[in-house]
Swiss-Prot record:
This is Phosphoprotein. A motif (Nuclear export signal) lies at residues 49-58. SUPFAM superfamilies: Phosphoprotein M1, C-terminal domain. One of its GO terms (biological process) is symbiont-mediated suppression of host innate immune response. It comes from Duvenhage virus. Non catalytic polymerase cofactor and regulatory protein that plays a role in viral transcription and replication. Stabilizes the RNA polymerase L to the N-RNA template and binds the soluble protein N, preventing it from encapsidating non-genomic RNA. Also inhibits host IFN-alpha and IFN-beta signaling by binding and retaining phosphorylated STAT1 in the cytoplasm or by inhibiting the DNA binding of STAT1 in the nucleus. The modification Phosphoserine is found at S64, S211, S272.
């Protein structure tokens, strides 16, 4: 009888192919679940929305009934208390937010990075609020004390001198505060302590899993492994970049477990050329969002 010899390396490669096939099947099933999310009552992904969102009209009988009641109440109110579109400061702000939302949808359809889009949107919103809703510093220290006029002129004249003295001392305190900066600077010590504790917590959790490899979706519909060591970055630089990911600072302040795979993917997608070549950006965005949602619900 002839004997058939099998090379052990062939067995190992076959087992590796089986493992890759199982992981690919899991990834395909997950993608199928994501594509059928609208059938399960899960919110639809932003990428599936049409470009012209204004054409969408979702009808709800109860909502229309409530709207009719609200309209009737508005007609019954006095017209003097009604704010037109020009007088209401929230109307242009809502228009600005709608424009930012449309811009985000267009950029995500072009395949641009999520965190880059989000950071630009946050900067636009913050700059708009700072320009249109800013409160002068002098109003924070405005003297709201009232002075009642007494019937006796002698008491009024006698109290005028100390009132002037108190007013001058109060103005001196206001000037000293204005010279030293806004009132928020009094909180710098506590803010610095909070920032140091947050950075320490983030650095601690990253250092514990610095060499641990995490799975990421590849462009070839498979997966590949990556860890923090392959970033070739200092721990301080990684922590600085990770703090830009939404929700990480809040979780670190609360002492929660951080989404390390999401953090690694966010930093690597902007600082590692090899990672950018290997990873599938669309699937990476979904994986990172799933990790954030999962850890924030704990």
């Amino acid at each position: 009888m002839s004997k058939i010899f099998i090379n052990p390396s062939d067995i190992r490669s076959g087992l590796a192919d089986l493992e890759m096939a199982e992981e690919t099947v899991e990834l395909v099933n997950r993608n199928m679940e994501d594509s059928q999310a609208h059938l399960q009552g899960v919110p639809i992904d932003v990428e599936t929305l049409p470009e012209d969102i204004q054409r969408l009209h979702i009808t709800d009988p109860q909502a229309s009934l409530r709207q009719d009641m609200v309209d009737e109440q508005k007609h019954q109110e006095d017209e003097d208390f009604y704010l037109t579109g020009r007088e209401n400061p929230l109307s242009p702000f809502q228009t600005h937010l709608d424009a930012i939302g449309l811009r985000i949808v267009r950029k995500m359809k072009t395949g641009e990075g999520f965190f880059k889009i989000w950071s630009q949107a946050v900067e636009d919103i913050v700059s708009y609020v700072a320009l249109n809703f800013s409160i002068p510093v002098n109003k924070l220290f405005e003297d709201k004390s009232t002075q009642t006029v007494t019937e006796k002129s002698q008491q009024a004249s006698a109290s005028s001198a100390p009132n002037r003295h108190e007013k001058s001392s109060q103005n001196a305190r206001v000037n000293s505060k204005d010279a030293s900066g806004p009132a928020a600077l009094d909180w710098t010590a506590s803010n610095e302590a909070d920032d140091e504790s947050v950075e320490a917590e983030i650095a601690h959790q990253i250092a514990e899993s610095f060499s641990k490899k995490y799975k990421f979706p590849s462009r070839s519909s498979g997966i590949f492994l990556w860890n923090f060591e392959q970033l070739k970055m200092n721990l301080d630089e990684i922590v600085r970049e990770v703090k830009e990911i939404p929700g990480v600072i809040k979780m670190a302040k609360d002492g929660m477990k951080l989404p390390l795979r999401c953090m690694l993917g966010g930093v690597a997608s902007t600082h590692s050329r090899r990672f950018q070549i290997l990873v599938n950006p669309e699937k990476l965005g979904k994986v990172m969002q799933e990790d954030l949602d999962k850890y924030l619900t704990y």
